[in-house]
């Protein structure tokens, strides 16, 4: 048996080579199932394109057969799977097109589940609920009902774009000095847990927009958790990288190392207790978590290991629903989350800086990359003044970050032939260093749209899985600032982000819906902590300003900057499907000549992207207001090839 690796040579050339698979690797893979088994329509029945990865050194035998598709979701599992030596499949298109609806998630199974809900007549929000629940099962290192989420929803029924803040909150017993004796407990263990909000947020949005039964939306995720799902390469890598975390927690160990050995990509994983929890929430609604038996079990598990979560915390949790924050940038209108998200404001500031040059050419070429780096540094210096507006007055900073005048003032500080030490950018506070997350985009036939980012923060959250509920606990308290914390950048912590009971921590999550002339132009968002804002900004510029096709806009190599250390991080890595992504040598040389210090980065943010063509193939849809029509152009959905997700189309 042979397996394929990719041998890469500069600048961007990768050559596939074949190596024999060791006997022990082949034997350990026997009986594994095909990740693409849960297909949702007949046109995918003959999929057999296999692409190997440089990160996983095993793939298995034989082509799939005997898949049975039924409306009861049995297609989520391989029939008689133990009879076959099957393979983990990460191939398939990173981009799909449709006139009727699309879902772009970071897992192919979840994209297809979302599309199934659209085919059943569901609103984009129905698809979003089912997709989010699926992601929480199959990508549990990044997402789940033990965490929180931001959602931006555009619905024709209300002619509004609304923001749903289901971000975790600090427990009632939390205080700004609670970690002064052991700062590690801010990031790991039960004390790092915020009050989870995802289920409450999904239910609140579904109540407003959903068409399908609440229970129906849970069935695919329940099936996956109860009867098993295949571990994708990205999850397999995360399990391996966090072996100590997994093996030190009884709940995580039971799910991800059930026989004392870590599960790997291609293995089947079960979380039966989570399936039971999802069944209860499906039957009884979110009250069973926030004021019922599931909540009581979760509180008991968390407090037994030293946490401070109480039933009162769960009962007090409220989803914040507001009009989405709107900003007019570069001839488009973006709709996103208000604070405590810093994403909408951060992206708006950077784009307004480019707009102030007076020409789209300002973003072109290697000089455009230099200007982007400088704009990002100014943005990061400004954004740490933000916090939860229910607790701190951030009116001045919100106004500045949306101001065209303020952006022009910053643009005048950007010099085209030089960069500067970090103190030039007028920083004051230590940066938020959030992690993880998962993002997906949904657009339906009516052009209703959902942009949702969901998170448990660090990989596997707090490193605690509640044994009685199967819920992985978030570590969102790590996103607060603490008065006594000494950060890697040696700057003082941001007072606007200090802990208070019921407060939401600052976030980099950037779910956006983009319109032009009141018509849907795009849906975008990303995962990857503080890398999200730079990544989403670059994809926006690549497509809407520089004219790249949607897939190319997402695939294009990216740069990142954190202000301190004063380093430009550039992508140089071979991703899950074997493609090598690296910043062009020409760009690296140019940036070094300007004084930038560069460092290669084998990682970055993951961006999902949906675009509607407004320049061609447009049909007028139904009237939604006086002399107003919804246009139906071709939808293109892209799942970032940096992870193992694939989009799906109706």
Language model feature labels by segment:
Residues 1-49:
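Short, low-complexity, Lys/Arg-enriched N-terminal segments of secretory-pathway carbohydrate enzymes
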Residues 321, 434-437, 459, 507-509:
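Short, small/polar residue-rich loop motifs at catalytic or cofactor-binding pockets
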Residues 143-155, 438-442, 511-513, 605-617:
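Short beta-strand scaffold segments in enzyme catalytic cores
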Residues 137-154, 158-162, 309-310, 449-518, ...:
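Active-site rim segments in enzyme catalytic domains, especially the processed small/beta chain
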Residues 483, 500-504, 536, 545-604:
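Extended C-terminal subregions enriched in glycine
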Residues 80-82, 259-260, 356-456, 465, ...:
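Internal maturation/activation junctions in enzymes
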């Amino acid at each position: 048996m042979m397996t394929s690796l990719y041998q890469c040579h500069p600048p961007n050339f990768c050559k596939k080579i074949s190596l024999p698979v060791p006997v022990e690797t082949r034997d350990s893979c026997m009986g594994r199932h095909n990740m693409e088994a849960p297909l949702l329509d007949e046109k995918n029945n003959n999929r057999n394109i296999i692409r190997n990865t440089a990160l996983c050194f095993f793939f298995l035998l034989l082509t799939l057969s005997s898949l049975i598709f039924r409306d009861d979701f049995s297609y989520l599992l391989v029939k008689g799977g133990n009879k076959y030596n099957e393979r983990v499949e990460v191939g398939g298109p990173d981009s799909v097109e449709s006139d009727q609806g699309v879902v772009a998630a970071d897992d192919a199974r979840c994209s297809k589940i979302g599309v199934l809900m659209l085919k059943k007549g569901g609103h984009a929000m129905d698809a979003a609920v089912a997709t989010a629940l699926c992601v929480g099962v199959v990508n549990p290192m990044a997402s789940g009902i033990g965490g929180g989420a931001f959602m931006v929803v555009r619905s024709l029924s209300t002619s509004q774009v609304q923001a749903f803040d289901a971000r975790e909150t600090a427990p009632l017993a939390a205080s700004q000095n609670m970690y002064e004796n052991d700062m590690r407990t801010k990031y790991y263990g039960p004390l790092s847990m915020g009050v989870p909000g995802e289920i409450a947020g999904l239910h609140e949005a579904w109540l407003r927009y959903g068409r399908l039964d609440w229970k129906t939306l849970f069935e695919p995720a329940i099936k996956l958790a109860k009867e098993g799902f295949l571990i994708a390469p990205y999850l397999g890598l995360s399990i391996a990288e966090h072996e100590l975390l997994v093996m030190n927690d009884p709940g995580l160990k039971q799910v991800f190392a059930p026989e004392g050995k870590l599960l790997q990509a291609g293995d089947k994983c079960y979380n039966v207790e989570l399936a039971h929890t999802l069944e209860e929430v499906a039957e009884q609604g979110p009250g069973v978590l926030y004021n019922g038996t599931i909540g009581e079990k979760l509180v008991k598990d968390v407090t037994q290991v030293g946490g401070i979560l109480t039933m009162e915390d769960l009962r007090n949790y409220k989803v914040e629903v507001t009009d989405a924050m709107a900003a007019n940038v570069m001839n488009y209108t973006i709709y996103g989350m208000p604070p405590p998200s810093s994403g909408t404001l951060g992206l708006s500031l950077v784009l307004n800086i480019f707009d102030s040059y007076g020409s789209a050419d300002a973003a072109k070429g290697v000089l455009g990359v230099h200007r982007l780096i400088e704009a990002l540094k100014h943005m990061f210096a400004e954004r740490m003044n933000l916090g939860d507006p229910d607790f701190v007055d951030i009116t001045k900073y919100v106004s500045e970050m949306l101001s065209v005048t303020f952006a022009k003032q910053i643009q005048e500080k950007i010099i085209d032939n030089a960069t500067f030490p970090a103190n030039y950018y007028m920083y004051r506070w230590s940066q938020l260093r959030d992690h993880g997350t998962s993002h997906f985009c949904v657009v339906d036939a009516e052009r209703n749209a959902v942009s949702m980012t969901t998170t448990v923060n660090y990989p596997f959250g707090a490193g605690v899985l509640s044994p009685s509920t199967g819920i992985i606990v978030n570590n969102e308290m790590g996103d607060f600032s603490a008065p006594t914390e000494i950060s890697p950048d040696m700057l003082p912590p941001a007072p606007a982000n200090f802990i208070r009971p019921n407060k939401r921590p600052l976030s980099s999550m950037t779910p956006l819906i983009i319109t032009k002339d009141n018509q849907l132009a795009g849906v975008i968002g990303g995962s990857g902590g503080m890398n999200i804002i730079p990544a989403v900004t670059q994809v926006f510029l690549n497509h809407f300003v520089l004219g790249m096709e949607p897939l190319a806009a997402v695939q294009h190599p990216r740069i990142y900057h954190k202000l301190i250390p004063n380093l430009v991080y550039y992508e140089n890595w071979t991703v899950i499907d074997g493609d090598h992504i690296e910043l062009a040598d020409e760009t690296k040389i140019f940036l070094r000549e300007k004084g930038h210090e560069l460092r290669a980065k084998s990682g970055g943010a993951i961006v999902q992207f949906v675009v509607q063509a407004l320049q061609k193939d447009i049909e007028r849809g139904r009237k939604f207001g006086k002399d107003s029509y919804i246009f139906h152009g071709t939808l293109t959905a892209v799942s970032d090839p940096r992870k193992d997700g694939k989009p799906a189309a109706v």
